[in-house]
Amino acid sequence: MKTLVTGGAGFIGSTLCRMLLEQGDDVIVLDDLSTGTYENLEDMDDGRRLRLIVENVNNASITDACVREADRVFHLASAVGVRLIIDQPVRTLESIVGGTETVLKSCARYRRPFLLTSTSEVYGKGSKVPFSEEDDTVMGPTSKRRWSYASAKMLDEFLALAYWVETRLPIVITRLFNTVGPRQTGQYGMVIPSFVRQALRGQPITVYGDGQQSRCFAHVQDVAGALAKLIATPAARGKVVNIGNDSEITIMDLARRVKELTGSNSEIQLIPYEQAYGEGFDDMRRRVPSLKRAASLVGYKPTRSLDDILTDVIAYERTKL
């Protein structure tokens, strides 16, 4: 089996590539290294079964050649992180929507099974918790850049589902909820690596807003395992599937737990959203997934707790000091 992973040099993508190699696949990685790195792939690159092509998925001819060579496609290439979305909205929209359209066209041309990684952000301001795949989505106004990412990902979902309806292209859409683990960068606003690095360096642990917003964090190994199973599951075709962990914690309690596990003396400092992201920033108070569909389709159940995640991230970040 030869598998194409767009965005395969990124945090989630590289973990998926490692799993695919372990199960015997040959892997093509298509990544422009805008957020991914060579380092994420170096420990598994034997020069034969994994090949990295440094190019943007918006390059239609290169992408088409990669899709044609592969037997199936995981599409992870995307702008990521709140900070990048706020700072570079044009890049966010063009890379997400244009890239997905390019990959889907080639998948349809060669009839390659396609898995899209979407995001829990598409639930927007929805208040029904836990979020189920068939729930309504509630977006904020277009004047607030924060919603450009969610809206672009929602358009990706519509496009993938349109290919399923019109051409029966085998597609699966996954909505990922706060995936975390070693090698994740804090550069683009990822909360756990940011907290851990601040704590280990004795810097203030900066919590945005009042800290009472809550999230659920899933280990990247659990998430990558679910992706690998879903693309190979016929019953998942044409469906949207939540992937994450349904154990909820407030961001303030997360900061306290990081401080405790690192043995840090850092203070916890509240930073207004406006100071962090500019005037008029919107956020979701709670984001909790229903995992019933994933469990039904592939027996998905997160196996690693938040403390497991934090322990792994802390151990990794200590090696970087």
Predicted regions and their residues:
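Short, surface-exposed alpha-helical segments at coil->helix boundaries
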Residues: 38-41, 157, 193, 252, ...
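C-terminal substrate-binding subdomain of Rossmann-fold SDR/epimerase-dehydratase oxidoreductases
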Residues: 19-22, 55, 178, 199-321
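Short, solvent-exposed loop/turn segments at secondary-structure boundaries
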Residues: 87-88, 183-187, 280-283
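A glycine/serine/threonine-rich, flexible loop-to-helix segment
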Residues: 129-131, 186-194, 282
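Hydrophobic alpha-helix immediately C-terminal to the catalytic Tyr-X-X-X-Lys motif of short-chain
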Residues: 155, 159, 163, 195, ...
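The catalytic Tyr-centered alpha-helix of NAD(P)H-dependent dehydrogenases
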Residues: 144-152, 176, 184, 188-192, ...
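N-terminal Rossmann-like NAD(P)+-binding domain of SDR-like oxidoreductases, especially those catalyzing
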Residues: 1-179, 313
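Residues that form or flank phosphate/diphosphate-binding pockets in enzymes
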Residues: 12, 36, 61, 186, ...
